[in-house]
Amino acid sequence: MTRLLMSFLLLPACLGLSNSAWAVWGKFISTGAGTSIGTPSCAQVATSHVVCAIRSGKYAIMVNEFNGTTWGSWTTLAGAVSSDPSCTSDGSGNVMCAATDITGKLRWSLFNGATWTTPALVTAALYSEPSCANYTVGQVLCVARNATGGLAYTLYNGATWSAVKNLATIAISHPSCTTDNNGGVICSLYTKAGATLANRYANGAWEGFLNLTGIAGGEPDCTSMNQNGNVVCFAKGYASGVYGNRFFGGAWAATRWGGYGAMSGTFNDNAGCTSHTAGLLVCGATAVTDNAFYANVWGGSSWSGWSKIGGSGTGSPACAPLGTGKVVCVMKALNNLITSVVGP
């Protein structure tokens, strides 16, 4: 069967890691004195306004704002957490950030563009960090592993959270969820033998797990292309390469996925990707060879190839759109401080 993704992600080996920039990136700047022990998470509030959250060395969530040029100061939210945060727009000008509390409950706070709500708890028994995504306007779905290795999920309707429900599966990794910007949320996870499972939440229900096969390691990363329900899920392969699998929207069926395609290069962790313009993507990753930040841009018909932007970091970067055709990407530097760069 012809794979839908052949023209989208299968790259010639010669692309590799390029030293030439695909477009204009700025210089790396410090985000301030906040130190992180995990992976950051960022989300757009408004044009040229992004918030990011990290888990500090004191097991608290710290948050900061970027105005398109400069960062504010890292602020600690109340409460102790055992996981990295997950942040998402709620589709109505707010950003929701949530993490697993040290009690296993879901700890969350909402940012309205100026202030954060007092962190509160949702009764749950979570066994991984959550992944939260905008469902419909003002609504956010959060999903995490549960005690039996399946998934636990809860929906915020703009005022209250639903009771946590469970979804049977075998999740080896925590899930990665994203809005499809078409009335649904798509989540992927790794299951036995490194295969990828994906499920879509739409019309108030899950549509069923699809086995996308593959042999993945690390953690998945899914992002909307902000176009006709298209979503791409990225994975780090067992040989440290990054692979992508695109869902082309429409009916929830395995035939609507293109299959994993290699993006070349070798990286410390999975790529962090976001859509900066409808139908286009920016991905960032830190290379095994020099720990530098590399970027790869999907321009609508082909990838630019990995271009060395600079810096020195570890783990997966987090990228968020600025609403200007550019993105801000943050990564944990080798000294555990967070640095950022804007492009392309």
PLM region spans:
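Positively charged n-region of N-terminal signal peptides that target proteins for export
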Residues: M1-L4
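Bacterial N-terminal signal peptides
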Residues: S7-G16
